[in-house]
Amino acid sequence: MAEVPADSRGATYLGFDFGERNIGVAVGQSVTGTAAPLRTLRAQPSARLWAAISELIDQWLPAGLVVGLSHQQDGSENPITAPTLRFCRQLEGRYRLPVYTVDETLTTAESRTHFYQRRRRKSVEFEQVKDEMAAQLILQTWFSIDKASPR
């Protein structure tokens, strides 16, 4: 969708793990290549979702937005791919910020592993934070790859 500008080193980015029920959000800094989970938003009602995203954008003033794009393990699209791309277009249209995508295959499974290794908590607690933890991994993955190519 967009190329990363050369002067964006040290910039703040918001990452999104899109789902039809919940959307995980993380914040990260490109200078360190690290991200932290922020919160999980309910996807419905739509007006409340966009108000919450607007609030986060006003608070963090990101240079861009990164959305995880899910595919099957063989690279083909899955049922969530089209709604995710629609969400990307909506973000771009509403906020006039560059929107980048990165492969998010297995990020929720990876976040589960990180959660249990570090916190040794109950599965109920994981369910509350899994989407924002997946958003954190999406953003960290994006920081670690060659970002010169557009979405």
Curated annotation (Swiss-Prot):
Major subcellular location class: cytoplasm
Protein's GO biological process: rRNA 5'-end processing
CDD domains linked: YqgF
Enzyme Commission designation: 3.1.-.-
Keyword Hydrolase: yes
Enzyme class: hydrolase
Pfam families named among the record's database cross-references: RuvX (PF03652)
Gene3D superfamilies the record matches: YqgF/RNase H-like domain
Keyword Nuclease: yes
Taxonomic superkingdom: Bacteria
InterPro entries attached to this UniProt entry: RNaseH-like_sf (IPR012337), YqgF (IPR005227), YqgF/RNaseH-like_dom (IPR006641), YqgF/RNaseH-like_dom_sf (IPR037027)
Subcellular localization: Cytoplasm
Assigned keywords, A-Z: Cytoplasm, Hydrolase, Nuclease, Ribosome biogenesis
Molecular-function annotations in GO: nuclease activity
GO CC, any one term: cytosol
Role summary: Could be a nuclease involved in processing of the 5'-end of pre-16S rRNA.
Family stated for the protein in its record: Belongs to the YqgF nuclease family.
Protein name per Swiss-Prot or TrEMBL: Putative pre-16S rRNA nuclease
Organism, as annotated: Methylococcus capsulatus (strain ATCC 33009 / NCIMB 11132 / Bath)
